């Protein structure tokens, strides 16, 4: 186990080649958002754009796309038909599959049992069908993790053809493992490592001093961040950032560890400006550019 350091992350994130083009930095397809959670999709795709992905496409329903297009003209759009509770209908699966991307991000704002059993069933169908057939790597977050937890009752962890990163907070990890959040927090490093190996995935166990564990036995503890991250939307930003670094070509463990470090470092800058109480997740996005610029990236 080691603590993620500034040297570690800046060695992993090299300056951009002078002859680079958008294809150099990969593409992210975010399957995210619903009528109730429009902001989750917006924060995730901006997190991906601000962290360097060459192309970011959002597959979502019209109200979400309208909100994102107004804020982020750089984001490509994949319009989807609405299903239960204004979420993405499984009828869109073949349409979504036709979108070319190197990384799939599934989960932010999709909706689950908090909306209805029908919404949960549709989100499960999206995850169960899209993830195994995806040719690249994937990040599973938020309601994507809730779907995976239910699917684990009857089958093994679903995988894309590439690498898989899971980004649970302790409550989501409890649903995935069947252990209580208290049990998980009592042994965060051990729990993350055990399930990273069991699921053959990188596990990002969020919380104070987020733990990043790989199936190869590596384990990092993050030193950056502050309690100002304890609000809805922070995890959506992190999911987008993680997807971007994966798309840029970093291996899954390095992508996750660097994203968590940058996320926390941006939060520390936001807290310095707005205070831990007043800062908001979108303040992290504003801080990322300065963070990269100061380090020649």
Where are these regions (language model features)?
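Glycine-rich phosphate/dinucleotide-binding loop and adjoining beta-alpha-beta core of small-molecule
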Residues: 1-6, 59-224, 296
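Positively charged, low-complexity intrinsically disordered leader regions
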Residues: 1-22
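Short, small-residue alpha-helix embedded
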Residues: 174-175, 231-262
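Charged C-terminal helix
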Residues: 265-297
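Alpha-helical segments flanking ligand/cofactor-binding loops in enzyme cores
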Residues: 42, 46-47, 128, 193, ...
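Short beta-alpha connecting loops at secondary-structure transitions
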Residues: 177, 223-229, 239, 268-276
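Substrate-binding N-lobe of the ribokinase-like
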Residues: 21-85
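Short pre-catalytic strand/loop immediately N-terminal to key active-site residues, enriched for Gly-Thr
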Residues: 17, 219-233
């Amino acid at each position: 186990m080691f603590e993620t350091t500034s040297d570690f992350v800046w060695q992993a994130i090299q300056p951009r080649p002078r002859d680079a083009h958008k294809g150099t930095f990969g593409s992210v397809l975010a399957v995210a958002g619903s009528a109730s959670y429009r902001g989750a999709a917006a924060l995730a795709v901006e997190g991906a754009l601000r962290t360097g992905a060459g192309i970011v496409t959002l597959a979502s329903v019209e109200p979400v796309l309208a909100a994102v297009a107004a804020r982020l003209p750089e984001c490509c759009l994949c319009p989807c038909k609405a299903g239960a509770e204004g979420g993405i209908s499984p009828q869109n699966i073949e349409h979504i599959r036709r979108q070319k991307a190197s990384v799939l991000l599934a989960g932010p704002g999709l909706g689950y049992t908090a909306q209805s059993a029908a919404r949960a069933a549709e989100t499960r169908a999206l995850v169960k069908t899209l993830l195994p057939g995806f040719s690249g790597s994937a990040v599973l977050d938020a309601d994507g993790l809730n779907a995976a937890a239910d699917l684990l009752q009857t089958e093994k962890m679903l995988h894309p053809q590439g690498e898989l990163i899971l980004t649970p907070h302790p409550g989501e990890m409890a649903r995935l493992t069947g252990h209580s959040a208290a049990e998980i927090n009592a042994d965060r490093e051990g729990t993350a490592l055990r399930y990273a190996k069991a699921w053959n995935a990188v596990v990002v166990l969020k919380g104070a001093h987020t733990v990043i564990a790989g199936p190869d036995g590596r384990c990092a503890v993050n030193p950056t961040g502050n309690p100002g991250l304890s609000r809805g939307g922070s995890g959506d930003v992190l999911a987008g950032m993680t997807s971007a670094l994966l798309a840029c070509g970093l291996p899954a463990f390095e992508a996750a560890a660097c994203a968590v470090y940058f996320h926390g470092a941006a939060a520390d800058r936001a807290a310095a400006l707005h205070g831990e109480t007043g800062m908001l997740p979108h303040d992290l996005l504003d801080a990322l550019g300065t963070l990269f610029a100061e380090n020649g990236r």
